[in-house]
Amino acid sequence: MKKKPISDSPGRFAYDGLDRVIHEKARLSIITSLATHPNGLLFNDLKDLCALTDGNLSRHLQILAEAGLIQIWKGFKDNRPQTLCHLTEEGRKRFVEYINVLENIVTDAVSVEKAPAEEPKLSKGWSPA
């Protein structure tokens, strides 16, 4: 459930829920791709969707698997090796939590868009740095 922002509370803009494992661009694209394909994706399909090289995708998949966010399955089809990647239940849960934090960030950003930029009202003695 999304929390309603409380203005100026301590840590208000810390966004602690931004999961560092997911937040990296390549891993975010992998997790998002897998979340939208509940039956999983083959390595080459995932590579194409995320525009990653074989080595780059392999390394990010390893990090996500070690974090328990994805499962990697090895098998054969037509005597050719295949790798299937699938989002775990824990991965799905953490991705949803991550998305909720992003929604809070978007809410904050929209409020900035609506508010006009103003010069601060300062007493004498202040000057721009």
Language-model segment annotations:
Residues 68:
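Glycine-centered, phosphate/nucleic-acid-interacting loop/turn motifs that mediate DNA/RNA or nucleotide
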Residues 61-62:
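Short, hydrophobic-biased segments on the C-terminal half of alpha helices
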Residues 2-9, 13, 32, 93-129:
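Amphipathic alpha-helical dimerization/coiled-coil segments
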Residues 72:
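Short beta-strand "wing" residues that participate in macromolecule-binding interfaces
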Residues 77-102:
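Basic, amphipathic "hinge/linker" alpha-helix immediately C-terminal to the N-terminal HTH DNA-binding motif
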Residues 13-56, 77-78, 82-86:
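N-terminal helix-turn-helix DNA-binding core of bacterial DNA-binding proteins
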Residues 1-5, 40-43:
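Short, charged, low-hydrophobicity "junction" segments
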